Amino acid sequence: MEANDSPHDVAVVGMGCRLPGNNNTPEELWRSILQKVDASSEIPRMRWEPYQQNAQNARSIGKVPRRGYFVKNLENFDAGFFNISPKEAEQMDPQQRLVLEVTWEALENAGIPLSSLSGSDAAVFMGVNSDDYGKLLLEDLPHVEPWMGIGTAYCGVANRISYHLNLMGPSTAVDAACASSLVAIHLGRQAILSGESKVAIVGGVNAIFGPGLTSVLDKAGALSSDGRCHSFDDAASGYGRGEGAAVVILKNMAEAVKDGDHILATLKGTAVAQDGRTNGIMAPNQKAQELVARKALDVARVDASTIDYVEAHATSTPVGDPTEVSAISAVYGKGRSPDKPCYIGSVKPNVGHLEAGAGAVGFIKAVMSVQKGILPPQANLKTLNTRVNWSEGVQVVQDIEDWPSSGYPRRAGVCSYGYGGTVSHAIIEKYIQTGPAIYSKEQWPKGTQVLLLSSPQRRSLETQAATQAEWMSTVGKQNDLRCVAATLGTRRSHHKYRAAFVVESHDDAAEKLNAFACQTPTKWTTSGGKPEGDDRPVVWVFSGHGAQWTDMAKDLLQYRVFRDVIESVDILVQKEMGFSAIQAMEMGVLNGSDQVQVLTYLMQIGLSEVLRSLGVSCGAVIGHSVGEIAASVAAGCITPAEGTLIVTRRAKLYRRFMGAGGMALVCAPLEQITIEISTQNVNNLVVAINSSPSSCVVSGPKEEIEAFALNLNNKGIKTIHVDTDIAFHHPMLGELMEPLAEALVGYVSPSQSKVAIYSTSASDPRSTMDRGIRYWLDNMVNPVQLTSAISAAAEDASPLAPIIKKILSMESRGATIQAIAIDISSHDAASQLSSRIDDLCFPPIRGVVHAAGVLHNEHVLSVTPDSFERVLAPKIAGSLTLNMLFPPKTVDFMVLFSSCGQFFGFPGQASYASGNAFLDALATYRRSQGDNTIAMQWTSWREIGMAAGSEFVRAELATKGITDISQEEAFQAWMHVSKYDVDHAVVLRSRALEKHEPLPSPLLVDIAIHKISSILTPPPTPPLSASSDLLPLPRNPADRFDSLSRQVRECVANVLQMETDEVASQEPLSNMGMDSVMTVHLRGRLQKSLGVLVPPNLTWSHPSIDHIVKWLMEKTNDKE
């Protein structure tokens, strides 16, 4: 059988749909098709209600066909899931809402986490041809709102998907009438093959909200009198309109194979054309339909005789069906024997004619047919159309049939035609896997599994659990529980709110999921929000000898990934050691210390790959004794084969010492045990491992270890025997160094580490020594410095680590850095500092920088003498101390770190501004004495300094259009200012620089005007809002906060059209759907409710309700 190996092939990896008859998944649609279900019904009562208000329209509506194929509860939409406010959702065409949800479902069906697509070149092409909802909204002129533009535009159907999923590839709505969605599939295939995109989201949508187009189609003779489709039937007289959405996920074939995607089918070729001038623009053209099919076959590079099934457009019109069947017969039926016809069918009698979405629905049906090997039966077919010649090699599928057997892969064609003349065709083929599956259930152990669910909203978890429970107890039983767990764990986006279920079977899973949905979770269920800081890199620590246990790795062998790793080096193990690692692990046998060393290493490298396959990675590695070999493999320093040679050849040499040595874990610090060894005169013992600050491991001859351990236990020092008969890391192993070096010559070629690696063999845990032969000789004999390695890793993860590295770098270049800790504001600070400087014997100090400060935000009326002094002390007393020690003209420069905050009058910073004003005055004084002193009035420094940790300060600066500066920019400003004879310099960074806009001129014009105005005229009494009966705010701070929080929540809820209890105080407003237009309305409501002037960028600088309330606390305090 031929394989899918053409470079023109595109993988179909996911599908989703929302169709009439509660067909909300492709599987539900398939079952409906097999059962010949006709999902037609009366139109929902409320759909045309707005048109009933006009008497003339109401009379005409009675003549419009009321039957068709409709989606129930089309008004339902989980707006919060997509961070869309209810207000904006109300003004979005339901077609946009529908494709958002179905696209999400299709991507989940594809097993593509949304995070993996964010920022990618993924394309979106969506067919759309109806704007019923837009007419309803935009023709109601008095109530037109800003969101109705994008909310009703065709482009919004595709663009919203790209926007909400953060996709950067092409994004286009496609209007080719009833061919729209198959044309979208064609464009998606082209985008992938051209290299423009790796993934394409394609499909179409239709929603019926007005009688206009239905009336047009009825008068044109396109609709059936009973609102049903009767494809290929002699009674066919038109179609029944259908609504819904169908979405298909296409992917570059090579990428899909590499990523281990579940490929549903292969898209071999597509073609799009126009039928030109015919008897009328809406009349079909048989020749054009034939030509586009032949073109698709040419693109697919397959012969028409290998196509066993064609999913026809088949709109049930008197002219359309005979024309299309004739075209299919001419292309696919020619030369076929009566017993091997080309089968045809159409999905329209099941779910209606979705017009712009019709082609994608037919495509989904055809994919499922080639995938399952079943030809599905035709619904609503009683008598074959007598206007068709059925003896020309085609046959309608009337009952469920197995796909005909042949010597080629199952292949199908899909037709879709638009009434404007667009004709389109696609060729699909069963996907044939040519190599071993990258991901399969064999990777996962049988038995207990963990099922993971997550959602952006807490309440949605219970709904998800109920849906999953129903699936588990029905169609989900056909799926291996291991595969279900793997998909939920590794091929889903993981959101803020999560739940995990430990399950033994499908029934057990359904029971626990249902219990969670009913808010009665069992003890084997856990849920909660995503923990903060869980994205920090982790350190993998590889244990040493003694951590082994019986049956170690036995269960892990059920993981395909783990077994592959062990099998890849098992031949080496057999050759070097004389036993099979696979067999030893399967039997759970550990024979001797030499075998334990090897199996411990193999266990570790296998487990590393299992973790990586589950998406777990490390930021650094540490190896304990023999664990350093596996750690080096995990870090990429050596290959698994090199590590195997090191551990096996060393293990063979260890055999010389087996039975002669021993080790003991002592629950006491290394320093204490070193003294014990000395006082007990057991000089053959050494501390081999510094395990932790409170424990260590002693190594030496067997008898002496046993006697030493007994003595320590008698003294009350707990000592535990280590399961080994070799004295690892003892000097006696020194005689093995030369033979080990000879055994490894030419077999180890170390590489640069791909992650941080901390040494436990070198004296410096951060040693960059390569993992060559010399390193492994040291690893065998040197003591294990585990405590030092862990401490180094912990230090390097600290925020101080970069600063320490900078200091060390400066010292390596000859600088001497000395920290002196004193209270610069104390009365004797000058004498303390002078004495300490003298002790250092430094050369004369030539420059001084004063950067001390305390930030304590407090309303001016709440300032106490103590709090005022606490803020002023480092500024005033500290600078006076330096002025006393280094009088004017005794140093080359003095720089005083002041702040720009005093210019802007930040609420709550009166004390801080006073302290900085003193620094400014001191700079002026020293300059007047001929000294080179300057006060730098800084904006916030990025990631350093007091303001860097203050969201309040950043937000206040942002209202002035000012951003923070990097350290590099700060020092550049400092160097620049030092060229001028000035006592003060204000350093600011305008946001205009980031937007490449011209700077405001003058930069601080608003401050200047404010200061001049305040001098010339008394401040006016601020007017109350139009509603002069503003509610007074409580004076108690806690009550005031609660009152403001309630009022802000009400304002936000009103703007977003949400219930007040649905508005989360700590959630960013943008996550609830607040956009730039809504912030204007919110600003107006806040000003009216609270009588406070609100800046235009309030929600940008104060992104949540809590942030806004904190800001209002300051502003309303100022009003008292």
Curated annotation (Swiss-Prot):
Pfam families associated with the record: Acyl_transf_1, CurL-like_PKS_C, ketoacyl-synt, Ketoacyl-synt_C, KR, PP-binding
Disruption phenotype: Reduces the production of sclerotia.
PROSITE patterns per record: CARRIER, KS3_1, KS3_2
GO molecular function, one term: phosphopantetheine binding
Enzyme nomenclature, EC number: 2.3.1.-
GO biological process, one term: fatty acid biosynthetic process
Keyword Signal: no
Record-listed O-(pantetheine 4'-phosphoryl)serine modification sites: 1076
Positions of the Ketosynthase family 3 (KS3) domain: 7-430
Domain Carrier: 1042-1116
Catalytic residues (positions): 178, 313, 353, 625
UniProt keyword terms in alphabetical order: Multifunctional enzyme, Oxidoreductase, Phosphopantetheine, Phosphoprotein, Transferase
Purpose: Polyketide synthase; part of the gene cluster 41 that mediates the biosynthesis of an extracellular and diffusible metabolite that is able to stimulate colony sclerotial production.
Protein name: Cluster 41 polyketide synthase
Organism in which the protein naturally occurs: Aspergillus flavus (strain ATCC 200026 / FGSC A1120 / IAM 13836 / NRRL 3357 / JCM 12722 / SRRC 167)
